[in-house]
């Protein structure tokens, strides 16, 4: 096999594709791969960069993928390293870490939709990383495409000169060659010193069944080869290099070395991705670099929920399944917890509601588990009367009211872009969700950008669905965490037959407690089947009952066999039945259907 000659750094381009969800990012990636013949026509399929079934079904990108492309321009061979990124707000950490390894980004905007909230958010991440941004207007072949207006939109909203914008149609394969040439002429080559000691940033890691934990790295300085011993700076441990590869969605391409400026996969024979944490630095064990790469933001969970197996004996199976998913998802964390109502399960941290849905669906589909998920919550900062601070992510952990000095809840800054005709409905929704308006800006005659600060708790329940319904699906939404603010919060408990069902407890704004409690008990009354005894459903704050509904018992005619008119005999039987029901009520357990736990999500 002929030894490959290293690609000169001046001929390497590392770039990402950033876009709002559904703007045709994965289709554009497919076109660039096909144009560069990185995958044969026989193996090429749509959304080749989306490798999970769930990504293909939902039409979304969850896991950032990379591919090495070779392209010849003006007689010179170039290497283009393409990193596809997710578009949904929950997976913006995947975007930020992918952009750390690039010099440029294609900003894809749908010619029929214009700039949307997530486009703006990802652009700011790219600008913070000093990336060269190349605007790309996609779907120009559609009859309702409005290219001129979108160009103006890009300039007015983001402040990027639209003059350089490339017009393409990924579906119809228009403008792809021009775009590849623009990438080469516009995006700068990587900087770095090939003669310095090795410094490589781990910007992704995952678990391979055959090779163990793999690190996707960008070589910032120096180079790496298969003969080297490597030091992982975060752990201080040394490992031999078992293999080096170029990334490709279908198969890893082996190589003997990775040079300065390149992107590649490193196999060190490790059993867990925790040994090669994302954001860590690899260096040469013999001649290490003086300090690791800084400024990398790790993913932090934003939403927490309890996951419990319906078959209680499958607790260990759930643990195994979560551990397997965690191998490829550094943002997923979990710890065991128990609930009086649901038994043993796990408190799981997610990036957002979509991330939670995806994880729950994968656990049920890939590991054949039947799960109950409790209502999602955020982390509250609870200041106690003894001047200590407790962080609470499970409502059942909230200390008694007389021990609490104040509670602070996390806030986010939300950016929403909406057609102006829905502005009234949207502002009403934001006010209902305790939003505080910071800015309102008309992008053009028909579109408005709103900036609000909102309690995180208000957006983790049903905000996204309500936003879509009050704007007929036209509004786009993005958020970033800002700070914790003091709030007037209480714990709302639900009691069924006198017992608090801990899995149904929620932390809520005090002014909304009565309304939510009333709606909750009314819904529960419809969902819980009638028992042989009377069941009281109560909503309480502290020891105070604020709402109550009663499920009447199923009647049994105990006097049916009493013929004749002896009223005392009938009365005796009815009294006996009443005594029996009283005893049953004291010891009877009420089975709650799964819908009861989901009821909290559905109630505004």
Swiss-Prot record:
Alphabetical UniProt keywords: Cell inner membrane, Cell membrane, GTP-binding, Hydrolase, Membrane, Nucleotide-binding, Protein biosynthesis
PROSITE patterns named among the record's database cross-references: G_TR_1, G_TR_2
Membrane topology: Peripheral membrane protein
Segments forming domain tr-type G: 10-191
Subcellular location(s) per record: Cell inner membrane
GO cellular-component term (any): plasma membrane
EC numbers on record: 3.6.5.n1
Positions that bind GTP: 22-27, 138-141
Catalysed reaction equations from the record: GTP + H2O = GDP + phosphate + H(+)
GO biological process: positive regulation of translation
GO molecular function term, any single one: GTP binding
Predominant place of localization: membrane
Name of the top EC class for this enzyme: hydrolase
Lineage top rank: taxon: Bacteria
The keyword Acetylation is annotated on this UniProt entry: no
Pfam families given in the database record: EFG_C (PF00679), GTP_EFTU (PF00009), GTP_EFTU_D2 (PF03144), LepA_C (PF06421)
Family (UniProt): Belongs to the TRAFAC class translation factor GTPase superfamily. Classic translation factor GTPase family. LepA subfamily.
NCBIfam families: lepA (TIGR01393), small_GTP (TIGR00231)
HAMAP family associated with the record: LepA
Role this protein plays: Required for accurate and efficient protein synthesis under certain stress conditions. May act as a fidelity factor of the translation reaction, by catalyzing a one-codon backward translocation of tRNAs on improperly translocated ribosomes. Back-translocation proceeds from a post-translocation (POST) complex to a pre-translocation (PRE) complex, thus giving elongation factor G a second chance to translocate the tRNAs correctly. Binds to ribosomes in a GTP-dependent manner.
Name of the protein described by the UniProt record: Elongation factor 4
Protein source organism: Helicobacter pylori (strain J99 / ATCC 700824) (Campylobacter pylori J99)
